[in-house]
């Protein structure tokens, strides 16, 4: 159509009449190839089956600069709309859990709850390093909207470094748009366990069991301030005074410090070897 308009200098109406096609068809412009977007959207939908197009758009906008209208259109064309059922859980296969070899490869999150003597309910938000078993944060508050969750995580990152991934359940605080956008910004992989499968976050479940058995069930909290004080004291004892059988009966803090010392020593040895190799290579090149 455009070629005819340019070649014969005719009007759009005249050309459409001669070709017997509607003017709307004459104005049609083919869309860009969406195959790359479709493939990535299918992949993201498999990884996050309970995410709608708005949350999936956060990934695609970050990776490809795609606007939300295009994501919505392609999402609907692919038939990826999330079903609104609550009785059945959509199960998905998790990747086999990798063997952890260093701190900050994976953190684990979960919540516990209790009540003060005055009847005020509160929640406890815990953060663990799955390798060192250290409790990195144990925050007490009456509620944990997603912005408070990310604030706690950023303080933990400032103290311990950034994790590669975070394992958690599918609670609303941990699947919100804000939390997802925060993880994308920080380049942290989110590992959401399957609904009804708490054993997929076994380390955190074990920690929560100890927290309840040794602190929440045995302490009388007069108010939130008292709860924060007693739970913080329990966290210190858990990290620095209690040996762990899987850590050769070292405390979690001892294990983390010894790992860091060994890692630093190994790095220095490798640097020394590299300098020696560079010196030998340089000497060999100077020989006649």
What are the roles of these predicted feature ranges?
Residues 1-19:
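Helical coiled-coil/dimerization "stalks"
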Residues 9-11, 51, 66, 222:
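Residue-level signal for the short linker/turn that defines the boundary of a DNA-recognition helix
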Residues 65-128, 134, 147-155, 159-164, ...:
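Mobile-element integrase/transposase regions
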Residues 15-16, 26, 41, 56, ...:
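Mobile genetic element proteins and their domesticated derivatives, centered on retroelements
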């Amino acid at each position: 159509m455009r070629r005819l308009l340019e070649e014969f200098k005719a009007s759009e109406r005249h050309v459409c009449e001669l070709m017997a096609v509607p003017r709307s068809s004459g104005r049609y412009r083919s869309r860009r190839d969406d195959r790359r977007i479709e493939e990535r959207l299918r992949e993201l939908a498999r990884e996050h089956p309970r995410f709608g197009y708005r949350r999936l758009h956060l990934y695609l906008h970050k990776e490809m600069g795609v606007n939300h209208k295009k994501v919505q259109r392609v999402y609907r064309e692919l038939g990826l709309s999330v079903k609104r059922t609550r009785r059945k859980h959509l199960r998905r296969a998790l990747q086999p859990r990798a063997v952890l070899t260093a701190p900050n490869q994976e953190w684990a999150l979960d919540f516990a709850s209790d009540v003060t003597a005055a009847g005020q309910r509160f929640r406890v938000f815990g953060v663990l390093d799955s390798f060192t078993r250290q409790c990195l944060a144990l925050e007490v508050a009456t509620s944990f909207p997603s912005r408070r969750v990310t604030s706690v995580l950023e303080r933990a990152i400032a103290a311990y470094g950034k994790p590669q991934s975070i394992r958690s359940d599918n609670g609303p605080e941990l699947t919100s748009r804000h939390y997802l956008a925060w993880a994308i910004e920080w380049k942290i992989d989110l590992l959401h366990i399957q609904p009804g499968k708490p054993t997929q976050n076994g380390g955190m479940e074990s920690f929560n069991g100890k927290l309840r058995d040794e602190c929440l069930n045995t302490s009388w909290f007069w108010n939130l301030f008292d709860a924060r004080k007693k739970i913080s004291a329990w966290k210190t004892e858990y990290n620095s005074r209690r040996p762990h059988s899987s850590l050769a009966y070292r405390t979690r803090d001892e294990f983390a410090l010894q790992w860091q010392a060994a890692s630093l020593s190994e790095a220095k040895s490798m640097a020394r070897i590299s300098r020696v190799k560079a010196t030998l290579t340089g000497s060999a090149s100077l020989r006649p």
